[in-house]
């Protein structure tokens, strides 16, 4: 299995270094649900601003404040402890009376607004996230500037970030031990983390192998293509390659890579043979995913940061703004810009 640090770069390995997250204020995330609260219903959507505390900790504190069970407070996604993050929590509080959440106090956390909502906020139910990052002590401004320009045109690999695999790769190691021993895993969280790490690692490896090709975005017979921003896909045929290539070049269509699991992967012929060869040696992880009935899926191979802009404060400090769809990793963007340094170089989102 290819180590995350050794995955293929789209724009070549960065020439310089830089400090990511010298302090939490250098990594700002604003969650974009893609919808507004209904204004009525048995749930309450609470928009919070937090710094120095993780999402689960805040959710548990909110449940305690509302005198409800912790499982009655949900969220669309975990946000990093070591960052300034804005996100929504959802508490199930039936009844006409609206609690006064302005009285909710927690160090490092502030309630920005709250309103009634009809439905529970479920994991993954967000449109995306807006990021504002500050990179400090940049050693090669010219290289970073050119890479930012190139990313606007060509995007970045849509890798799952290193944090998906746990500190020191612990989630992936857990998946490998599980695959090798076949011992039942009772802890639901461990099961989820380990299976997710296994599938993500296989996806990253397929993308890394594809990026070694001279023309990364060249459509081949049997590729699974998806409309930009959509989840469904269709299979490319030889007769359509020229037209499909035009649409890929125009960013109307995205080439996808497999999230291996049980069932068909989605590609056919040449593309399927390539994907199978890319992970042929990872039989244990593939067997684990099939055994645990994790369905195969697809994910775009490349990621195009939206609304990308940047501002150099000086020759060694740059502030970068961009928006990413749900499930994408800001660290996969930063990875193409600089070789990161600092305690939190691999901890984000």
Curated annotation (Swiss-Prot):
Q: Could you state one GO cellular component term attached to this entry? A: cytosol
Q: Active site: which residues?
A: 80 (nucleophile)
Kindly state which keywords UniProt assigns to this record, in alphabetical order: Isomerase, tRNA processing
* Molecular function GO terms recorded: RNA binding; tRNA pseudouridine(13) synthase activity
Residue ranges annotated for the TRUD domain, each copy included: 155-303
- What protein family does this chain belong to? Belongs to the pseudouridine synthase TruD family.
Reported function? Responsible for synthesis of pseudouridine from uracil-13 in transfer RNAs.
Can you name this protein?
tRNA pseudouridine synthase D
User: Source organism lineage?
Assistant: Bacteria, Pseudomonadati, Pseudomonadota, Gammaproteobacteria, Enterobacterales
* Gene encoding the protein: truD
């Amino acid at each position: 299995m290819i180590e995350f640090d050794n995955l293929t770069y789209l724009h070549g390995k960065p020439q310089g270094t830089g400090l990511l997250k010298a302090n939490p204020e250098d990594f700002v995330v604003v969650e974009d649900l893609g919808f507004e609260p209904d204004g009525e219903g048995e749930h309450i959507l609470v928009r919070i601003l937090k710094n120095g505390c993780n999402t689960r900790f805040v959710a548990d504190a909110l449940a305690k404040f509302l005198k409800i069970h912790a499982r009655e407070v949900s969220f669309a996604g975990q946000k990093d402890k070591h960052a300034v993050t804005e996100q929504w929590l959802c508490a199930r509080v039936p009844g006409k009376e609206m609690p006064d959440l302005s009285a909710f106090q927690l160090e490092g956390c502030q309630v920005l607004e709250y309103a009634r909502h009809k439905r529970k906020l479920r994991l993954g139910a967000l449109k995306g996230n807006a990021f504002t990052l500050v990179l400090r002590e940049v050693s090669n401004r010219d290289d970073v500037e050119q890479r930012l320009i190139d990313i606007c045109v060509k995007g970045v690999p849509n890798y799952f970030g290193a944090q998906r695999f746990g500190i020191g790769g612990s989630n992936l190691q857990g998946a490998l031990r599980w695959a090798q021993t076949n011992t039942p895993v009772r802890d639901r969280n461990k099961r989820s983390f380990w299976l997710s790490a296994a599938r993500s690692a296989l996806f990253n490896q397929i993308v890394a192998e594809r990026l070694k090709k001279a023309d990364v975005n060249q459509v081949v017979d049997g590729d699974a293509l998806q409309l930009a921003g959509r989840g469904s896909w269709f299979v490319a045929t030889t007769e359509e390659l020229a037209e499909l290539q035009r649409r890929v070049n125009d960013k109307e269509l995205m080439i996808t890579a497999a999230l291996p699991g049980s069932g068909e992967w989605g590609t056919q012929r040449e593309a399927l043979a390539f994907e199978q060869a890319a992970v042929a040696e990872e039989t244990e992880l593939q067997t684990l995913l099939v055994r645990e009935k994790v369905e195969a899926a697809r994910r775009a191979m490349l990621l195009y940061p939206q609304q990308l802009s940047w501002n150099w404060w000086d020759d060694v400090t740059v502030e970068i703004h961009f928006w990413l769809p749900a499930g994408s990793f800001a660290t996969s963007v930063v990875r193409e810009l600089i070789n990161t340094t600092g305690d939190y170089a691999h901890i984000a989102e």
